């Protein structure tokens, strides 16, 4: 439900090639922030391989499910991505903004962002000893990752995974409670920790 249609994806890629365009990237979603839907990541990865395209996963919300032993199977195919975006300020319980991009090959970031002005030569890095400005757009930046590191040190991934699993259960409980009531409609069923519902009493329009 609410997933990418991979048949239409194949058709769109073929149509672009027919026009002489060069499709180069597909972005799959690992848990939308409105319905919790997860795209068929393994299938999308296969399509990307067939067409020599970059496969990025928007895991801003749902990538945190990887910390849940019970539910991480829902993100099967994540390991096939070339890059993943992941917001710790969504489901890793951090304050805004704390997010990350994970890449399979750091050289892609380094060769895209590495700069070598004269005033930085005294702290020049390389692929073995990376300076963060060599793998992103910012030079001076706040220590956004420190709060996540501290949280992981204090709570650990097991406790965070349990909290994520509790979020799944809360969504299911809410859905079951609403289904027992009159005039309430489930718009999208409980997925991850998301549930959409509305009040549908007679005489009321949308």
Could you describe each region identified by the protein language model?
Residues 1, 124-125, 189-190:
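Short, ordered beta-strand-loop transition motifs
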Residues 178-187:
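Surface-exposed helix-capping loop/turn segments at secondary-structure junctions
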Residues 60, 106, 151-155, 191, ...:
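Histidine- and/or cysteine-centered catalytic micro-motif in compact active-site loops
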């Amino acid at each position: 439900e609410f997933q990418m249609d991979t048949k239409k994806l194949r058709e769109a890629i073929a149509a672009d090639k027919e026009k002489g365009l060069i499709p180069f990237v597909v972005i799959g979603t690992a848990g939308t922030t409105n319905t919790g839907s997860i795209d068929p990541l393994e299938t999308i990865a296969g399509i990307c391989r067939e067409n020599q395209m970059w496969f990025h996963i928007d895991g801003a919300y749902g990538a945190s499910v990887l910390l849940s032993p019970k539910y991480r199977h829902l993100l099967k195919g994540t390991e096939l991505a070339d890059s993943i975006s992941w917001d710790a300020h969504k489901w890793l319980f951090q304050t805004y903004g704390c997010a990350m991009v994970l890449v399979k090959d750091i050289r892609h970031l380094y060769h895209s962002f590495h700069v070598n002005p004269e005033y930085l030569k005294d702290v020049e890095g390389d692929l073995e000893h990376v300076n963060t400005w060599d793998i992103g757009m910012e030079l001076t930046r706040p220590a956004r990752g420190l709060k996540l590191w501290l949280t992981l040190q204090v709570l650990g991934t097991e406790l965070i995974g349990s909290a994520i699993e509790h979020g799944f259960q809360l969504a299911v409980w809410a859905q079951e409670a609403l289904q027992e009531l009159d005039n309430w409609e489930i718009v999208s069923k409980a997925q991850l920790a998301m549930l959409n519902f509305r009040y549908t009493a007679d005489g009321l329009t949308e």
